[in-house]
Amino acid sequence: MPKIKWTNKDFKVFTIDGLEQRMDALNLHVRPKFNQLGEDFSAFFSSQLGEEFFPHVAKHARRTVNPPKDSWVAFAPYKRGYKSLPHFQIGLWHTHLFIVLAIIYEAPQKNVMAERLLAHKSLIEQLPDDFIVSGDHMSPEAVSLEVAKEDKLKEMLIRLRDVKKGEFLIGRHIPKEQATKLTASELHQLTEDTFNSLLPIYNIIVGK
């Protein structure tokens, strides 16, 4: 039975001033939910993709001054980390919930991954129109897939391939006003539906 529901208090964590104060609130309100989602969806990915996936809850351990503007749990088939691999994420900015598949700049094979995506761009374009794409995991901004189909999607994938800092994220952004109204069951279903739509894209990325 799904247990996790997002509240306004969860989103307000990212408006609290001060590193220590925000981290305390994050640890109290948000991280336990990421831990539970980590358990639930690592089992989902392991089952769906046929290899063991591990959850990685963001620790923000390197921060000494600036409080985190977002936080997340990531999923990858590697116990010691996820940033060098294509990975799935569930996370929050103060404005929205994000449910995405990500390739970030630390992935050493991202040029190969980008070529695979370019070769199957039509499959990406068949995803639901309420999906978004982004070229920067450090920014809350994104472009709707419906708009990106024109030329932005190709531009992003070429940048992913050719530019060292190029990144690619795809999935859903759910405004906090909508996310906080979802029941635990509705939220779980939406998250699972989003990831199910992204599984074929993940398989393309990893060459399956």
Language-model regions, residue ranges each:
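Sequence-level motif detector for i,i+2 pairs with an aromatic at +2
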Residues: 68-70, 128, 165
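Charge-rich, low-complexity N-terminal segments
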Residues: 1-98
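Long, solvent-exposed, polar/charged low-complexity segments
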Residues: 1-46, 142-208
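Compact, glycine/acidic-enriched structural inserts
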Residues: 101-153
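Short small-residue beta-strand/loop micro-motif enriched in glycine and branched aliphatics
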Residues: 98-101, 179-180
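Short glycine-rich, low-complexity/disordered patches
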Residues: 40-57, 126-140, 204-208
